[in-house]
Amino acid sequence: MAFTYWDKEKRMTLKQMIQQVTINEQENELTHYVFTTPMSMPTFGKPMLGYVPLNEVATSKFFSNVNDFDRDNQLAMAHFQDTTITRAYNLTNSIKPGDTSLPDAEVAALKWFWKFFTSINLVRQPPMDNVLYWACQFLSSGTSFLPLEKDVEIVFSGFQGSHTCMFASLRQMNLSPILCPYYEHMTNFKTTAEIREYVDANEELKSLITYLCLCTIVGLCDTFVETRNMETGEYVWKVSNVVSDNHTPAQNIGKFCYTTQNAKYMIQLVHVLLFPLTDNKYADLPNYVAVITQGAINQSLPRNVVNNNEGSNSDTTTDTAPSTSGIVSGSADTVASLYPDEFKYVQS
């Protein structure tokens, strides 16, 4: 693909691509990390205002085959060219699982659009040698996937104090011109060790991969909502649009575990991409992300009990914790026994 609109002399540097600003002006001395993208970066299409939940993608027959990436990618790129991602995303609003009326190329584009995520969600344990390779191909073959347009504030509690990460003005960006110089080299590597060595030697490429991880984190965090108890100042996590007061505790636990199951693979991805790298600035990100899962799991502790005796589904709290109506019930041990792997990357 040709990118004639990009001036190579103005390619983004590490400092321009990800600007870290530390602010300690809060009364509780929270540390804010503000990641911004320069407004001069080329954009196209409409900003993405959301994303299709992974559980919906995973149940769609359209995305059940994870072995035909190359064919789908070629069809999609030939059909949509520069706007593959935009067109594929728009199609998800009108397509229904099992629909056979779409042209093969459009179906292929949809499958290609979600390939990076479904390869994690459906294969369950993808070869780690391939994860970084597909991440780079996903970025370099069209655009990055930024799930949210508006500013998002995410609070991580319980890991070395409290940290606030703000992802400012995220938009759909075309990062291909920046990644293209690296792409040929990346596709020739056979092992994760080779890729890591190459990435470690290229600060700009490292920043872009980091950016992908940050975007992935934002997509994951959209599943959760944090609220603050104004009396104690404590931040608590709620699982958003996952659980319901109308469901039984068992149903809620099942939905919660599915959400954290998805979270685990996102955390694995961040570990693979960032943890081995030498840049200490980003080395702790996996731990911060792990707190998301831990925070959600904390919501299942006994203090947020749903009393199901005699068919009742009313909430019962045993202390002065903030209202958690609709939060998953049951003990942490119950959740862990159902899905023990969820705790694999959670730091105590």
From Swiss-Prot:
It holds the Pfam family FAKV_Clamp. Residues 303-331 are annotated as: Disordered. InterPro entries: FAKV_Clamp. Residues 312-325 have a biased composition (Low complexity). This is Uncharacterized protein VP7. The gene is S7.
